[in-house]
Amino acid sequence: MAKKKKLTQGQVRRVRDNQQKRLKKQADTIQWDEAMLGDSRRGLVITRFGQHADIEDAETGLIERCNLRRGIESLVSGDKVIWRKGLESMAGISGVVEAVEPRTSVLTRPDYYDGLKPVAANIDQMVIVSSVLPELSLNIIDRYLIAAETLGIEPLLVLNKIDLLQEAELATYREWLADYEKIGYKILYVSKRSGAGIAELEAQLQDRINIFVGQSGVGKSSLVNALIPELDIEEGEISELSGLGQHTTTAARLYHIPSGGNLIDSPGVREFGLWHLEPEEITKAYLEFRPYLGGCKFRDCKHADDPGCIIREAVENGEISEVRYDNYHRIIESMAENKANRQYSRNKKADL
């Protein structure tokens, strides 16, 4: 069998644009006359796809599939909306979203072509899920923490699949993560299989809109199944050869947790893009750096080999984690590379 030719980024983008145009054309064929719509109601966005969204009515709790009014482009899970129900359904569509209420927060993900793309709204807590398989990456944890701190969303670190570890191995993981507890982050050690830490996780999620983020294969969907047993979300299988997740949730979706609180399961991402941030924003997002900011000899200190850098001195004195400090510089370097690649992509796009 001939091997399928891999699509270029430009071809992938054109296919995606054509799909969106078809969805928009389908939505445009459903025209709601004012006489066909009821009174305005409040609702919560459960999930959004193309020109449609599933809206939970604030009064009845029923989920209705709705079209979006023209001009509503940014609509994501967690958004609070004003919508109107049709007197009868049309082609499976129950109503129309009229407006989006102001957000308290919005989690965005950078896109090389389209800039910042919203992922979820009105988030109270970012649950950063890691696992012992795929291999734990502190660099990726730090990227998510930067995102949480920059957006003003409280982070919660969760290490999943601890049932795969012997007691001595678990102690090693606790040692690796001790630096995060030292600077004030809460860490939970959990396992769906053994049930360890699930009750504590439930308690941390109550009375909040939470978003689960993390690499593919870390078990976000398996934790959703543990928290909401009546759901049967397809779980990512782990390849024995690569150790990477073969399946990942394709769209962000909000779920109600029986024990209290709401949960948004987001698409898995390999790493969290931060190229849209300035280096100064990355620096401020490191909690342990904050007491030292403004104390370096030079105002434009890069906190590397600069003379009189008190952050580097704090690292040498054991006051700041060397691992976190090294990750900081790797992230700053990768930001510069990604910004250059993005500019190249924009120039290439302009030539198409």
UniProtKB/Swiss-Prot annotation:
Domain CP-type G: 104-272
GO annotation, cellular component aspect: cytoplasm
Enzyme class: hydrolase
Any GO BP annotation: ribosomal small subunit biogenesis
Region (Disordered): 1-24
Main location: cytoplasm
CDD domains membership: YjeQ_EngC
Entry's localization field: Cytoplasm
Record EC number: 3.6.1.-
Chain residues that bind GTP: N160, K161, I162, D163, G214, Q215, S216, G217, V218, G219, K220, S221, S222
High-level lineage: Bacteria, Pseudomonadati, Pseudomonadota, Gammaproteobacteria, Vibrionales
GO molecular function, one term: rRNA binding
SUPFAM superfamilies per UniProt: P-loop containing nucleoside triphosphate hydrolases
NCBIfam families for this protein: PRK12288.1, ribosome small subunit-dependent GTPase A
Family, as annotated: Belongs to the TRAFAC class YlqF/YawG GTPase family. RsgA subfamily.
Cofactor note: Binds 1 zinc ion per subunit.
Chain segments annotated as coiled-coil in the UniProt record: none
Entry-linked InterPro entries: G_CP_dom, NA-bd_OB-fold, P-loop_NTPase, Ribosome_biogen_GTPase_RsgA, RsgA_GTPase_dom
Cofactor(s) essential for the protein: Zn(2+)
Claim: RNA-binding is one of the keywords in the record: yes
Native organism: Vibrio vulnificus (strain YJ016)
Listed name of the protein: Small ribosomal subunit biogenesis GTPase RsgA 1
Function comment: One of several proteins that assist in the late maturation steps of the functional core of the 30S ribosomal subunit. Helps release RbfA from mature subunits. May play a role in the assembly of ribosomal proteins into the subunit. Circularly permuted GTPase that catalyzes slow GTP hydrolysis, GTPase activity is stimulated by the 30S ribosomal subunit.
